[in-house]
Amino acid sequence: MSDLTDIQEEITRHEQQLVVARQKLKDAERAVEVDPDDVNKSTLQARQQTVSALEDKLADYKRRMADAVSRKKMDTKPTDPTGIEPDDHLKERSSLRYGNVLDVNAIDIEEPSGQTADWYTIGVYVIGFTIPIILKALYMLSTRGRQTVKENKGTRIRFKDDTSFEDINGIRRPKHLYVSMPTAQSTMKAEELTPGRFRTIVCGLFPTQIQVRNIMSPVMGVIGFSFFVKDWPEKIREFMEKECPFIKPEVKPGTPAQEVEFLKRNRVYFMTRQDVLDKNHVADIDKLIDYAASGDPTSPDDIESPNAPWVFACAPDRCPPTCIYVAGMAELGAFFSILQDMRNTIMASKTVGTAEEKLKKKSSFYQSYLRRTQSMGIQLDQRIILLYMLEWGREMVDHFHLGDDMDPELRGLAQSLIDQKVKEISNQEPLKI
């Protein structure tokens, strides 16, 4: 459909359809507000999908229109018989054809890259809000994160709660919590809150509050996080007392056997790791930790703290800065990200499809976590991750939620009842459960 007239007709037609679809969506939203039953909810979902599909098609046709107009302009230009663009510096034509023109006007190179954030400014901003609005926003961006991001992609949203307000000249005004929901092309400012940065900073500042309210991201729920955190103090204490395969202490003659035994334990390896971390501090993160210590936040100062694993309950995409200098914490997050990759690999392996389709269902949480955490100024100790995997890997895999299928006999019975009922009320072919 290269003809401009045809494309314009399609754009007009789709715009008309979109107006009707949006009106139907509004009607469906009103119906759900009045009577939120399953039928109205499914109708609302269908209307949302229709609007989304029409918007995508309309955007595609507008893109085609822009390309066609651009091509037409290019066609009217006098062409160089050599096929070289007028402003190309090559004397002879390249073997490559000319591609798209990339407009970089919107990019600000003074801003830091996506992997860098101003954690101190972000932390001070978040700590300035009341705990209820912070935890409710965390719930919306973790437990209900996928839905929230999908509905608000490409916008800067505001969370509002009655507990969050400010007095201006005696007038009480809501104090909104702003979070940006970027698309893949968005450029984020260093102090700008995104869902990933918000989860990271809040998980690091308020793990005790998260633990008390049992707020958990679905991706952590399916790898058995609830099982893992049960009896955490006893679990980590036992782990610390076990012999570490990476330590070979230099024992002087006459050293008591009890002391020799202690020097071989995981606890000693963690103490050595803590010494390394103490020498690698970044000034901004130290400033944030000091600021947080003066207020309500409950950041763990030791991996044996009861709330330590809850730092990762909402699946932050890196180790939170407030506990990055606690030995074993960054590696614990890496252990969870490997478990997520392991579960996704198991799920991809059991699905039907080509090898390429299965490969698409695999994930790389670990690589992403590693890259983001190391961008904050520390190197992860792979040996600690290995110790975690040796200690807890098998039992965690046994507690994965793999969406197990129905019992074959139960499925057969349910299907026969469906078939029978459909035949009674209709001449249509019954669907499979």
Curated annotation (Swiss-Prot):
First-level EC class: hydrolase
Residues with site note (Important for the endonuclease activity): 88, 103
Main localization (coarse): virion
Alphabetical UniProt keywords: Capsid protein, Chaperone, Coiled coil, Endonuclease, Helical capsid protein, Host cytoplasm, Host Golgi apparatus, Hydrolase, Nuclease, Ribonucleoprotein, RNA-binding, Viral nucleoprotein, Virion
Region (RdRP binding), start-end ranges: 1-50
InterPro entries recorded: Hanta_nucleocap (IPR002214)
Chain intervals for the UniProt region annotation (Interaction with host UBE2I/UBC9): 188-191
Enzyme Commission number, as recorded: 3.1.-.-
Motif interval(s): YxxL: 178-181
GO CC annotation terms, alphabetical: helical viral capsid; host cell Golgi apparatus; host cell perinuclear region of cytoplasm; ribonucleoprotein complex; viral nucleocapsid
UniProt-annotated stretches for the region Viral RNA-binding: 175-217
A Pfam family: Hanta_nucleocap
Subcellular location: Virion; Host cytoplasm, Host perinuclear region; Host Golgi apparatus, Host cis-Golgi network
Amino acid composition bias (Basic and acidic residues), ranges on this chain: 68-78
Residue ranges of the region described as Disordered: 68-92
A Gene Ontology molecular function term of the record: endonuclease activity
Region (Homomultimerization): 1-79, 100-120, 330-405
Coiled coil region boundaries: 4-71
Disulfide bonds: none
Chain segments carrying region Interaction with host DAXX: 377-433
Annotated spans, Interaction with host RPS19: 150-175
Family under the similarity heading: Belongs to the hantavirus nucleocapsid protein family.
Domain free text: The N-terminus is required for chaperone activity and, in trimeric form, this region likely serves in high affinity vRNA panhandle recognition. The N-terminus also contains a coiled coil region, which probably participates in but is insufficient to initiate N trimerization. The YxxL motif is indispensable for the interaction with host MAP1LC3B. The central region is involved in specific RNA-binding. Has distinct cap- and RNA-binding sites so it can bind simultaneously both the vRNA and mRNA cap.
Subunit details: Homotrimer. Homomultimer. Homomultimerizes and binds to viral genomic RNA to form the nucleocapsid. Interacts with host MAP1LC3B; this interaction participates to the protection of Gn from virus-triggered autophagy. Interacts with host SNAP29; this interaction participates to the protection of glycoprotein N from virus-triggered autophagy. Interacts (via N-terminus) with host RPS19; this interaction probably mediates the loading of the 40S ribosomal subunit on viral capped mRNA during N-mediated translation initiation. Interacts with the viral RdRp. Interacts with host SUMO1 (via N-terminus).
Function comment: Encapsidates the genome protecting it from nucleases. The encapsidated genomic RNA is termed the nucleocapsid (NC) and serves as template for transcription and replication. The nucleocapsid has a left-handed helical structure. As a trimer, specifically binds and acts as a chaperone to unwind the panhandle structure formed by the viral RNA (vRNA) termini. Involved in the transcription and replication initiation of vRNA by mediating primer annealing. Plays a role in cap snatching by sequestering capped RNAs in P bodies for use by the viral RdRp during transcription initiation.
The protein, known as: Nucleoprotein
Native source organism of the sequence: Puumala virus (strain Bank vole/Russia/CG1820/1984)
Native organism taxonomy: Viruses, Riboviria, Orthornavirae, Negarnaviricota, Polyploviricotina
Gene: N
